[in-house]
């Protein structure tokens, strides 16, 4: 065994062994329990960042741990390789998205291999390849045939100068990123999948996700947003028209003082013909955001339409206002406004001088709505026949009256909207629909799939090449001329079913059901909580679609979900001569000064600039505080980077990158190497004989097996990898202090090292692989079993008992592990220190906490 730890040499040899022996390639095996471990696959942006490394290290730790449990472990990897960044990079680099993407995949693939992740590379997929998206297109046509796909107009960002659709990221301060033209909202036809048809099941099945974080489940419940309410009809005074609104608070109906409708509502369009102010407002709203998040914070504005709604119960007329906070594509495009009991309605009413009436008050007092709306549930008043009813009774009474009079119905609504999957981009999977010469729209026949995306294109930064090339759209279906759809799929489509394709990545069908049902559901899924409401919901939805197509048997795609925290790093900047901030990489900071609490108070970069320190923030390009994993691997080795990632923080919390911590992890591995090196150079011929061990040897062995128990629980059940590492470090401290003078001393240290390299194998696999062989094991560590706790070793012959006299520790005594209270009390009373402090006192009370404490009260 070489004396010095040389990570680059060791890691290269071990990785070559894994590659040559296809160590992590797996097939279905009915005789073994399976375990499918999956980290969210990366977008091939060009280089891995530390967020990737944390995600994939966690996944690899779980996968390797389960492998040593004797399970058949699948851990695949692939590339979420369609998307807008490739188009932007292609424009900037004067290339096409395809070669840029494939080059990035190769580079990042090598980075992943250098980090030692145990992937089954034979299952690698890239979503931009026809072999993958062919089956996505096929499945979309099947969903269309089942009535789960439809086309309708929806709003997009439109640049009138370039005459092209812009992604949200391409709108900067309301203008086109390329030509600075003000962006408009334009209605164009788009394809949708009916996720709302599964809303109830998606909501109810959240209760079955026992292995998912509560925070993610709550976010999904809120996103789906089930509500029970009443849909009711208001007439329009002087017109033979009516419109519907939906409310979850029918108990407040008697307090309606105005109605707000979307600028795009048919009534607003009618009123605008004779109302120039309203017409201008409608045009303005057409070009403003439709994002709910932005609407929540923007100024609430409106214009009176001049129309009046007829209250469905009282017959009273209330004004109809067009308002910028009502969305035509959300609900009915109209809301009843009760400013006495809704704060947004209250503020709008105050702004425009509209009436405010109170109709709900607390059970035990009066209500004051002079400064703010009263939004709690309470008792109805000023509500005619409904006075005195509480929320539930008022809800039911008003709902029943509306239903009885044919003016309303009880209804369950969802906040969730159908999934718009059309994107007016190039670098995505073409949507497999065609329009025949007579205008009929049909799916592309299966024998014409895949609809290939041409990869040899020129990006002009304005229009999608497949939209610009009129010839590309021309095709024939059943002998008829037809035009292809030139929109491409939302890239969430690819990431919604990739996990299932890994089960049979080379199958000449979407999924091989036998293989899919062997591996699925995923046993452990790992990714960021930022995906809670988009990817993770589509992921669940797609699984149910696959189930209903007969391709999988399970109801949910993943049993357990771990959402890892972000990786943070120090962020520094200086102000340049133009007054702009220039962010400086932490690696380029030459000197820092810290206060007595370790906080940075001054920093200078390598060019002598005095820096402003802004604290720890998420590693990002914008703040130039990302740390290149490759630089760290070259400096310290992959095992050190992995160990730091697992030790520095619990997995769900943010991790603060500190190179001093990386150095500490490196020192620990060198300590382990040194201890193993010293041990293999000893005479280790004597086998362990537990019957001959001294009490000190038994105590050391007890620490070994306590550590095995703790690490097993920390990794396997609690997923607290940081405390698992801490437990091994503590055991190492015991071993380094232990004597190595007898054969049994060496035998115990040998047993301990055998356990340690397996306990650490999931985290630092290269050094563990090497040390396992150096310790004299015939087979490789991947073929070994996880260490098993010797329960007998945990049994203590004796206990150390703390003795207190009147609340102060006066002695510590050793007693037999099974000693009863009387025996412990007798031993305590004859201890010389206890006798000293009881001199002249009378014992009044003795309390014994078994195995821990003897407390004597005397006066």
Swiss-Prot record:
InterPro entries recorded: aa-tRNA-synth_I_CS, aa-tRNA-synth_Ia, Leu-tRNA-ligase, Leu_tRNA-synth_edit, M/V/L/I-tRNA-synth_anticd-bd, Methionyl/Leucyl_tRNA_Synth, Rossmann-like_a/b/a_fold, tRNAsynth_Ia_anticodon-bd
Gene3D superfamilies: 2.20.28.290, 3.10.20.590, HUPs (3.40.50.620), Isoleucyl-tRNA Synthetase, Domain 1 (1.10.730.10)
Highest taxon, organism lineage: Bacteria
Keywords assigned by UniProt, alphabetized: Aminoacyl-tRNA synthetase, ATP-binding, Cytoplasm, Ligase, Nucleotide-binding, Protein biosynthesis
Alphabetical list of Pfam families matching this protein: Anticodon_1, tRNA-synt_1, tRNA-synt_1_2, tRNA-synt_1g
Single Gene Ontology MF annotation: ATP binding
Amino-acid positions noted as binding ATP in the UniProt annotation, renumbered to this chain: 621
Position of sequence motif 'HIGH' region: 42-52
GO terms for cellular component: cytosol
Keyword Cytoplasm on entry: yes
UniProt key word Zinc: no
EC number(s) reported in the record: 6.1.1.4
Family per record: Belongs to the class-I aminoacyl-tRNA synthetase family.
Listed name of the protein: Leucine--tRNA ligase
Species whose genome carries this gene: Shewanella baltica (strain OS223)
Gene: leuS
